[in-house]
Amino acid sequence: MATNFLTQIFGSRNDRLLKQYRKTVERINALEPEFEKLSDDGLRAKTQEFKDRIAKGETLDDLLPEAFATVREGSKRVMKMRHFDVQLLGGMALHNGKIAEMRTGEGKTLTATLPVYLNALSGKGVHVVTVNDYLANRDAQWMGRLYNFLGLTVGINLPQMPREEKQQAYGSDITYGTNNEYGFDYLRDNMVYEPGDRVQRMLNYAIVDEVDSILIDEARTPLIISGQAEDHTDLYLAINKVVPLLTKQEGEADPRTGEGVTVPGDFTVDEKTHQVFLTEDGHEKAEQLLGEFKLLPEGASLYDPANITLMHHLNAALRARHLYHRDQHYVVQQGEVVIVDEFTGRLMTGRRWSDGLHQAVEAKEGVQIQAENQTLASITFQNYFRLYGKLAGMTGTADTEAYEFQEIYGLETVIIPPNRLSKRDDQLDRVYKTTREKYEAAIQDIRECYERGQPVLVGTSSIENSEIIDGLLTQAGLPHQVLNAKQHAREADIVAQAGRTKMITIATNMAGRGTDIVLGGNIEKMIEAIENDEGRDEATKAADIAHVRDEWTRDHEFVKSLGGLRIIATERHESRRIDNQLRGRSGRQGDPGSSRFYLSLDDPLMRIFAGDRVKAIMDRLKMPDGEAIEAGIVTRSIESAQRKVEARNFDIRKQLLEYDDVSNDQRKVIYQQRNDILDAADLSAQIAALREGCFTDLVRQYVPAESVEEQWDLQGLEKTLSNEWGIDMPLKQQVEAAEAVSDEDIVDMVVKAANDSFDAKVALIGQENFTQFERMVLLQSIDTHWREHLASLDYLRQGIHLRGYAQKQPKQEYKREAFELFGQLLDSVKNEVTRQLMTVRVQSGEQLEEAADALESRGENVSNITYSAPTETGEVEVRLDEENQRRIAAAGLGLGTLGAEAAAFARVGRNDPCPCGSGKKYKHCHGKLS
């Protein structure tokens, strides 16, 4: 109450910011007449003038009014579009590192040109982030004309581009690309073996288009680069035979009394959390069955450390059978399991569930089981975008998530007023008892719109629902077009024409995002079609264009008179923001429009969160069949349910981020080390530090710290140094000859002997010949252990919640154990690198160079590299790295290269891990060749 009172007096934070920005808008408007008088060359010369002023110490904020005036004038000349004052406000919010909420149709793409131009003047690069390749291409070409006119370079960063083209795109003043591609380039840059192979420069400033989609909807799914891992096909098939023999328990047991179970069973299913849990009896039965199938040794428990993987596979098979259903969560097409996206209903071709779940579903369906992948590198969008020096975003719907943007990213949301107020009529929801009644009412509404000529956009949340509407409209004899997973290529064209008279378009949630629905149809597309028709001469084209313009004007006014675009939705999404996005398709730039949601008590959101309350209202009112309830209290109940779901989803994302922050800190350390190794001209100091650490640890196994001579095992230490490290030193003799020797002296003696042994090897061929080999051994070891570490963190994360039962804080336990694992990773790298460099037998610089090249090739040529990333529709896309596959094929690694490498590793013990980093024993890997 007090807050509202103060807001009325002083205005909200948003009002105060806009008031401040409006003063700058007045200064920009005052400059307009002066800039209009400039010639094209004079306007273009402003860019160099601004750069010179920055070099002399002026800030971007000092230049803002003039820079914005330059862009506005350039846009008038090149694009025939003048920035509105509200677009200048949006540009200032973006420059200040905030999120600008601008309604659909308010010109976000043009608004972005203002801060993009201003920040590009610094010469540090600006990244414009879009949700898909189509928009990146479209915006770069469309707005590129303006930037080029003003003397700035523009690059487009697309998937599968050759490395040289990517470097050129990132070297431009302004780079357009998708969020996924920027993130993957960052990960790939931290996997290269040559400094010149990196493509990105510093992460200076990014503007994220559709920021809610990228930083919230896609934030639960990390970017993952993976390669082929070990094959467990037989295990999946065997466990698939065990699972049908376990029975489901009906009812839930009260933890205090044990009552509540109606039918005893081996496992319970929790649909809300999407998990399956074995009961106590179920554990015993599962262990017995696994023993019968020879999967579990006699007397062993599923909880033994050695059987963690088996438990993991059993859980995946139970979830696959009881929580993932064919034609609802996935479809089987051409012998493959294809996931159906729960939000949009689109088929996610190429995407695979992780943690062995996809393979378990493949085993259940009896299709070919494809091998699991090993994660090579991974990052979440939260942690990638927080690497930028300055971040900003724009969207039509950010206000409902403003708290999350502030909490997670430190981004403030500024609501930019529309240029013209919307005339859209958002009608109250209509709630019916059954799904059948709901669809009948929606079809009747569509029929009425069609008969009077009003265009309709029908929004659905899944392919399944869009197909139901499609079938009902066909049955009703109403012509329409469907926009879902099967129509990707035509999305923008269909959406552009969805505003024509008598047009009925069915669209899943995010289809065709980024394209405006213009009442009467998109005239630009119509004119473009005429201009591209080579069969017409210029005079005919001009006449046809004039005719099309007249016809469009009539249609436009006619559709406006009917009430504009009608939005009909057949269910509420669990996020208010996505409902608002659907509504926002109508009533653009002051056009009329209307929207209505048709719901039933059977809808998932109603059933789980709001159904009982609304059903009670219906029963009290004694509603007859076919009648709907339409009241503010119902709409508010539904919005309250949505708020609960949004809060829950926010908590999930926040918790994920807190866990990911642990691996993010470790990722920064590893990537920093990698870059230092890549850029260093000489690695001898780093290698010496690793060697000292390794031999100190070795000595401490035989000569404990602060111990007396009687506790020392010098004979054992001598033997180990000779057998494992090739260092022959009469340690016992030296100690006996000396007057007084401490444990620290022993360490110094052994480290000196190791240094002398290594220096003698280096002196043989020269340090400069050795550096590249050292670099490759270091990078290979870091990469191999980092990948194993990522898998360990993943497994740790999955079981960490169980620590809560031991009265421990799972998050703290995760941090502690992850830190221990990271310490083990660094120790493993230290020991492995030292062992490889100490035991390698070197005869010539050429031989060492060949071995370094072979290590580099092995590091770069991982087979079947795939990229897993969320898309703007909520689906997760997985694609193969075609460039990588071509490079491997071209390299054609043969025995000659491997033979040279094997010779270089000739002093490695037969049962030791192979120095190439494959994880196999030396005798089963390169030892075969020596």
UniProtKB/Swiss-Prot annotation:
One of its GO terms (molecular function) is metal ion binding. Its EC number is 7.4.2.8. Its cofactor is Zn(2+). It is found in: Cell inner membrane; Cytoplasm. Keywords: ATP-binding, Cell inner membrane, Cell membrane, Cytoplasm, Membrane, Metal-binding, Nucleotide-binding, Protein transport, Translocase, Translocation, Transport, Zinc. Pfam families: P-loop_SecA, SEC-C, SecA_DEAD, SecA_PP_bind, SecA_SW. Belongs to the SecA family. Part of the Sec protein translocase complex. Interacts with the SecYEG preprotein conducting channel. Has a central role in coupling the hydrolysis of ATP to the transfer of proteins into and across the cell membrane, serving both as a receptor for the preprotein-SecB complex and as an ATP-driven molecular motor driving the stepwise translocation of polypeptide chains across the membrane. This is Protein translocase subunit SecA. The gene is secA.
